[in-house]
Curated annotation (Swiss-Prot):
Regions of compositional bias (Low complexity) in chain numbering: 295-326
Keyword Cell membrane: no
Pfam families assigned: HTH_1
Protein name (Swiss-Prot/TrEMBL): HTH-type transcriptional regulator BlaA
DNA-binding region location: 19-38
Family: Belongs to the LysR transcriptional regulatory family.
Gene: blaA
Tree of life domain: Bacteria
């Protein structure tokens, strides 16, 4: 039986002294209120009301039970209020710090139109995984290799000066004998300090004979960008980031690099709900493409013609590069 609503009918009828008026106060019909009170009496094994007169009056047992019934109804009402508040509370989502404020704002706005309230929290790759594991967030966009990803973001190298080539070969950064320094560096932002990106670049660095210091992880994107703007260094980033920062972007000649992301949640229903309603908007916020990055064999980015120039602020028709500096 529904003890809470039976107690609600019992309390309202006792307060109003009438089954008809009490039922209306409890927002139920008189017949439903009568059945619920009768069911409660049967459950307790004692009568709650004396029905001998026209106005129902409490029996001694009913007077004893009324305070507890009131407490139960109050607690149930509080529980309902808490449930409504919890349903309307924003869903906290851990997202990469590389996402721009504008794109995250658009994501939050679009989610509201689809009956999901998001509270986005930016964090690095390891921290996002930990936030999901400890359930400090409801869901998170986690970094994975592109071949395991739902969304992929192509990566390349961007600099402050406009290059004359379609691709940047990491080998071209090696200082030749007698060549004046300093050596040009590749600046890696924290979002890309993961084995499937920084680890692959480190192996390439060693293979082509660069110095260890020529590949460095910056403490944040601001520091990395400042280093690039004040030197000939290059930033590992996506085409969208390069465009936002006013840098010239090219794919890496020797490697096809991409960030990969999956949506994870402590409760799978949360992940399914977000994927089902927000997948294209999450992809846009990440700067993701349907492909997994530019192809070093052609220099073309995802969705780009092999004959067109990829990347941000690019000039069409730039020449191919061998091992010349970018």
């Amino acid at each position: 039986m529904d003890v809470v609503n039976a107690c609600r009918a019992f309390v309202k009828v006792s307060e109003r002294g009438s089954f008809t008026v009490g039922a209306a106060a409890a927002q139920m019909s008189q017949s439903v209120a009568s059945r619920r009170v009768a069911a409660l009496e049967k459950h307790f094994g004692e009568r709650l009301f004396d029905r001998a007169s026209r106005r129902p009056s409490l029996t001694p047992f009913g007077r004893d039970m009324l305070p507890a019934a009131r407490r139960l109804v109050r607690v149930a009402d509080v529980l309902e209020d808490e449930a409504r508040a919890a349903r309307s509370r924003p869903m906290r989502l851990a997202v990469p710090a590389s996402c721009t404020t504008a794109e995250l704002a658009r994501l939050v706005a679009d989610s509201r139109e689809r009956d999901i309230r998001l509270d986005v929290r930016t964090a690095g790759p390891e921290q996002r995984a930990e936030l999901v594991r400890t359930q400090e967030v409801r869901a998170g966009l986690l970094a994975v290799p592109p071949d395991q990803a739902l969304w992929a973001v192509p990566l390349g190298l961007a600099g402050a000066d406009e290059p004359q080539t379609r691709r940047v070969f990491v080998e071209s950064l090696r200082l030749r004998r007698g060549e004046p320094g300093p050596a040009r560096c590749i600046r890696v932002q924290p979002e890309d300090d993961v084995p499937h990106i920084q680890g692959r670049l480190a192996r390439l660095r060693d293979a082509v004979g660069l110095r260890p210091a020529q590949l460095s992880v910056a403490p944040d994107l601001t520091s990395a960008t400042a280093d690039v703007l004040s030197s000939d260094d290059l930033l590992l980033c996506s085409p969208a980031q390069a465009a936002e920062l006013g840098l010239y972007w090219r794919p890496v000649g020797e490697l096809r690099l991409a960030r990969g992301y999956v949506l994870d949640a402590a409760v799978e229903a949360d992940a399914e709900r977000l994927r089902g309603r927000l997948a294209p908007y999450l992809a846009r916020a990440l700067g993701a493409t349907a492909d997994h990055g530019p192809d070093p064999a052609t220099g073309a980015g995802p969705g780009a013609d092999a004959g067109t120039e990829p990347g941000a602020r690019a000039e069409p028709g730039a020449p191919e590069e061998g091992a010349q500096a970018c």
